[in-house]
Amino acid sequence: MKQISSIFIILCSISCGGPRGNWSDPRVILISIDGLRGDILNNSTYTKDYPNLTRLMTDGEYCTSVQTVFPSLTYPSHTSMITGVTPAKHGIVNNRPFMPKNNFVDWYWYADSIEVPTLITKAAQNGLVTVGVSWPVSVGAKMDWMLPEIKSVNDTISTIDLVRQHDRPESFLESAKVFGVVPKDGNPSGYNRDLLLHEIFMDAFVRKAPHLSLYHMIETDLIQHKFGKSSNEAKDAFMFMDSLVGNILAFLDDNKLWESTTLIITGDHGFRNYEKQVSLNRLFEKEGWLTLNNGSISDWKVVCLGSGGSGFVRLKDPTDQEFKKRVRLLLSEQDAFEILEQRHMNGALWAS
């Protein structure tokens, strides 16, 4: 009984104490709905399907033609949101770091991979209270209250245990259990995961009154990848996210916080339907330039790391000009794609 009481006191001190803002202070809430596209506004039933987004468009300002970064992936885009620079400058040039020997299974989870200052670091320097829930590239970020986005890529540890290792402050996730937010066996997926993340965000936001909130909604992206951007499933996913946004609006309404609140709803990238998938690494394997062993890359002279609708081709020895010519010739003979080299990219795409 004494041990249980000690644990509860520790968790309660984490949950009830620590940095807290003031509701009269100015605050920014940045919500990213993964895969949110401007063309969903073309749906004739938009106002009925998405009443909360419609309200924000009516009462606030909106833009339907935002240009994302290159490459148009979740992690580069989210990092540009909080740095204001392109991936070429902030260093998160893909969802996954270039690690062919581990089959590119790891992602850019860690905030120390970002090469420039962020909103998070600036907020910390100015003594502002911050909350982050499932924000990409946030593991290790100096946020006051943070549940990072990270996923287990092997059988040695579960995703929920990884999150427990990296939340801030220590036992932030456990403290949410004390408040009845997280179920004891909480390792959900799909809509249940987004619902759980929403409960955690609302719990932290209400109790901590942060100056800066970063909140990432996920399932809209996964549904569009699985069923297509124009599917009924995608429409349902956006309707679900709209309802979560509605909970935040209701809290701001009930507590009369609009005068001190700037709320930003955005997406990170769009979607295009496709019929074919190109595997350049299979092409390189046929040429003997890449070796696979039980589906894993064991050796390579050239390799491609996919980046959504594009891919980065790298040579192990970039100084081998003769081999570079052979690779360029092979790629130029394919009709499924075009080749862009750095000299072809304008500043909007790849400003370094």
Say what each PLM segment does.
Residues 23, 40-41, 191-215, 220-261:
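A long, amphipathic alpha-helix that forms part
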Residues 37-43, 66-68, 78, 105-110, ...:
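Second-shell loop/turn segments in exported
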Residues 29-32, 63-65, 80-82, 130-134, ...:
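Structural recognition of the beta-strand scaffold that forms the well-ordered cores
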Residues 86-228, 335:
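His/Asp/Glu-rich, glycine-adjacent segments
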Residues 26, 71, 97, 101-111, ...:
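Secreted, luminal/periplasmic, and some membrane-associated catalytic domains
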Residues 18-61:
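Active-site-proximal N-terminal segment of extracellular/periplasmic enzymes that hydrolyze or transfer
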Residues 24-29, 59-62, 126-131, 208-213, ...:
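Loop/turn elements at helix/coil->beta-strand transitions in domains of secreted/extracellular proteins
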Residues 1-24:
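Bacterial Sec-dependent N-terminal signal peptides
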